[in-house]
Amino acid sequence: MSAKDERAREILKGFKLNWMNLRDAETGKILWQGTEDLSVPGVEHEARVPKKILKCKAVSRELNFSSAEQMEKFRLEQKVYFKGQCLEEWFFEFGFVIPNSTNTWQSLIEAAPESQMMPASVLTGNVIIETKFFDDDLLVSTSRVRLFYV
């Protein structure tokens, strides 16, 4: 095992996504929240989010995570897949993570134009969000969450 692989394993071992919520960015109202560690690789997670989230012009995502390890440049790359085809890609950067810290990270996700939005009935169960967790260029974990619109 290379030093990079070992480092990625150490970071992942000490990393936990404690909770996450999604809010309507305009009103601040929480639309969905969960405490499952959606960063765990190797399993397909599921999230049931309200259909009305699709009507929001922007969604504010708040992540609370703990890390035993220091990270120089913690960042996420996310891809939204519909029936296996990538529809959207997002990039988020948190930056430096203090070792043995718990952090809350808020990000704004702008919606696709309404003309490009598919109805919840078509999307539900067919959308997977793949999240890659990085420390700079070092891939730490890849997780997948299947979305159901309720």
From Swiss-Prot:
Homology family: Belongs to the PDE6D/unc-119 family.
| Subunit note | Interacts with the prenylated catalytic subunits of PDE6, an oligomer composed of two catalytic chains (PDE6A and PDE6B) and two inhibitory chains (gamma); has no effect on enzyme activity but promotes the release of the prenylated enzyme from cell membrane. Interacts with prenylated GRK1 and GRK7. Interacts with prenylated INPP5E. Interacts with prenylated Ras family members, including HRAS, KRAS, NRAS, RAP2A, RAP2C and RHEB. Interacts with RAB13 (prenylated form); dissociates RAB13 from membranes.
What is a biological process (GO) this protein takes part in? visual perception
Q: Which SUPFAM superfamilies match?
A: E set domains
Task of the protein: Promotes the release of prenylated target proteins from cellular membranes. Modulates the activity of prenylated or palmitoylated Ras family members by regulating their subcellular location. Required for normal ciliary targeting of farnesylated target proteins, such as INPP5E. Modulates the subcellular location of target proteins by acting as a GTP specific dissociation inhibitor (GDI). Required for RAB28 localization to the cone cell outer segments in the retina. Increases the affinity of ARL3 for GTP by several orders of magnitude.
Where does it live in the cell? Cytoplasm, Cytosol; Cytoplasmic vesicle membrane; Cytoplasm, Cytoskeleton, Cilium basal body
| Tissue specificity field | Retina.
As one GO molecular function, the record gives: GTPase inhibitor activity
Keyword list, A-Z: Cell projection, cGMP, Cytoplasm, Cytoplasmic vesicle, Cytoskeleton, Membrane, Sensory transduction, Vision
Membrane protein topology class: Peripheral membrane protein
List the lineage, top down.
Answer: Eukaryota, Metazoa, Chordata, Craniata, Vertebrata
Region entry Required for association with membranes, spans: 144-150
One GO cellular component term noted in the UniProt record for this chain:
cytoplasmic vesicle
InterPro entries membership:
Ig_E-set, PDED_dom, PDED_dom_sf, Rhodop-sen_GMP-Pdiesterase_dsu
Q: What is this protein called?
A: Retinal rod rhodopsin-sensitive cGMP 3',5'-cyclic phosphodiesterase subunit delta
Q: Does the keyword Isomerase apply?
A: no
Q: Does the keyword Metal-binding apply?
A: no
